[in-house]
Amino acid sequence: MTQKYWEKKPTSFKEMVQLVEKYLQTEIVRETKDKQLYYHNLNHALAVKRRANSIFQAIKPALSQNHSLQELTRLESLIDICGLAHDMVQVFEPTSSNLSRKRLSGLSETETANKLLRYIQELNQALSTEKSAPTFLFSDREQQIIRDAIIATICIQDPQGSKTKTTFFSYSIYQPYLYDPQTKISLVGSIIALADLGALGMDGVEAYIQDGILVFLEDNPYLLELVLNCDRPNSLAPDVTKAKLLTMARFIVDLAHERQARFEQEIAGFMPQMRQILRNQVFIYLNQDSINQVKTLVPNQSSASLSELISFFCSNKIKTIST
């Protein structure tokens, strides 16, 4: 049985984490190939892991006031796992190949958490039979933290839409976990949620725009030739193509506004000292200059021509995507 999980038996919790991360990377690559994922792939998983770790490292001195070094080390491992794992499973609703793909909100995240925890529980069981130290295993609480953190990344449409001061368009998306006033199991969920939508604030305008185009391509894989080679699809009328591209362009711009407008609410669950660190040291690009750059670079006005929109989506920044 143990040969299924390792070639060499883990001799520490760190080695257990390495086994889990190896499993996650293998599964993400498989899911990417099976489902033609241009955004929710290993690049995104590694980016979220990196951003989550950056958040953790920045606030670690503040956390160390109430946590031991051993606790922080295990917490960092959980953050790395959750950042890597959070989009491992992608579940699309059935649709024809020439229509946009849709997901049921929360289903992919739930399936991801279930799949990961099944593996961890099997790994725990396999190591238990080897009479390994209990500290090598993922505790029940740590498993709860992992589930909580993956569920924290669920995005839904804001039912208030543009009626609230913090939103700008009728199909606004946000992560309700960050707005839930109930006490969290740990900070891991909030860290992963912030990292997941943190491309603009942490990585800057170019990374944010590239992510937006990749999201569009993943939801509309039949437009691959448009994004790669600037070829307008013959199956769509020009006005339909323009409307689809313009809608996504506006979404990219409006979401940038929202990332900035929602930020203070989304970090409200952190201690004041940590909030100041997040503002000044981590989300350094979440400012009006970045918003203005996005508005300038992304054609989002009704007057934008079809050729201008195609030129934007068929950008050199996207030439390196894996097909």
Describe the residue ranges of each PLM region.
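An active-site-proximal "capping" alpha-helix that borders the catalytic cofactor pocket
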Residues: 48-55, 105-126
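Acidic/His-rich, divalent-metal-binding segments that scaffold phosphate/diphosphate chemistry
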Residues: 1-95, 102
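Amphipathic alpha-helical scaffolding segments
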Residues: 99-111, 208-219
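Low-complexity, serine/threonine/proline-enriched polar segments
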Residues: 117-119, 123, 129, 134-146, ...
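Divalent metal-dependent phosphate-bond-processing catalytic cores, especially two-metal-ion Mg2+/Mn2+ enzymes
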Residues: 2-8, 54-75, 85, 89, ...
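Acidic/histidine metal-binding catalytic segments
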Residues: 62-77, 81, 123-154
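Alpha-helix capping at helix-to-loop junctions
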Residues: 90, 94, 118-129, 152-159, ...
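Conserved aromatic-histidine-acidic binding/catalytic patches
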Residues: 36-40, 72, 76, 99-108, ...
